């Protein structure tokens, strides 16, 4: 059995575990008053639709886990825990750094409260089942030899790419505001239109630069695992990161709103999906253009 098949099976099981744990801690969060009132109504009654969705993402993350397994620190099931904590960093923590400036503090606390339990459990489950299946079906396979580069080599290209990503996000936000596609997010307060535009550019540039610097460092680590050459490597990497971060999060929200017939919110979310995808493509183009493999 190939390692990616083992990863997909382990991910399927871990995705089911993710659903159960998410449901438990989501309900606990609701019971203690987390999440804004307008959002709570969409948070309940989604178990049936969440099961196939979380299993799908579990399979996707399981396949990726099988590809990067030998690059992850630790041994055995601890690799799975590290992998889960990595996703806790780049998904809920990253997402909430974008939401808090808009005043969605209670939602951010609720999401982090659930995620701090869900992602480590997902990672451990993935690590356990991957190891069990790997030991049974690929017991003689040794550690893969993957050529990696110093993560510091990706810091500056990542930071510059993040600045450009932030500028792109700021332009899109201003265009959306001018055309009436979306207004000021819940919790946001502005004094003037110009102030709103400046805040959009400033916030997006700063936050995207910080996270893109981190993504740039990991790009150097997984460079030889990413499809494509030169600039296209950057684009492929960016689209993968979009898929497993913003793309994954948007799919959860989209399903929750669709399950409650909130179709206006669904339409806005679909627009956001393409907007964030565009921003990531800009990041990938610049990263691929600027990154240079360190000299041996």
Tell me what each language-model feature is.
Residues 1-296:
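Juxtamembrane/disordered regions of integral membrane proteins
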């Amino acid at each position: 059995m190939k390692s990616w098949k083992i990863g997909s099976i382990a991910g399927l099981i871990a995705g089911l575990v993710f659903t159960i744990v998410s449901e438990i801690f989501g309900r606990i969060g609701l019971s203690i008053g987390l999440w804004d009132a307008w959002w709570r109504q969409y948070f309940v009654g989604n178990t049936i639709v969440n099961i196939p969705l979380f299993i799908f993402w579990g399979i996707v993350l399981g396949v990726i886990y099988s590809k990067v397994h030998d690059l992850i620190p630790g041994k055995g099931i601890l690799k799975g825990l590290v992998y889960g904590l990595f996703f806790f960093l780049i998904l809920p923590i990253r997402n909430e750094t974008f939401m808090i400036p808009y005043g969605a503090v209670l939602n951010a606390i609720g999401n982090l409260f659930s995620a701090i339990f869900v992602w480590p459990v997902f990672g451990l489950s993935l690590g356990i089942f991957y190891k069990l299946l790997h030991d049974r079906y690929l017991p003689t396979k040794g550690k893969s030899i993957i050529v990696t580069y110093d993560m510091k080599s990706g810091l500056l290209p990542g930071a510059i790419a993040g600045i450009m990503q932030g500028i792109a996000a700021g332009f899109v936000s201003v265009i959306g505001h001018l055309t009436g596609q979306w207004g000021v997010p819940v919790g946001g307060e502005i004094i003037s239109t110009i102030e709103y535009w400046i805040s959009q550019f400033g916030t997006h540039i700063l936050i995207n630069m910080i996270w893109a610097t981190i993504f740039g460092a990991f790009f150097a680590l997984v460079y030889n695992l990413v499809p494509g050459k030169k600039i296209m490597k950057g684009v492929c990497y960016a689209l993968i990161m979009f898929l497993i971060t913003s793309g994954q999060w948007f799919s959860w929200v989209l399903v929750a709103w669709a399950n409650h017939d909130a179709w206006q919110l669904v339409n806005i979310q679909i627009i956001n999906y393409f907007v964030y995808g565009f921003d990531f493509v800009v990041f990938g183009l610049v990263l691929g253009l600027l990154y240079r493999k360190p000299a041996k």
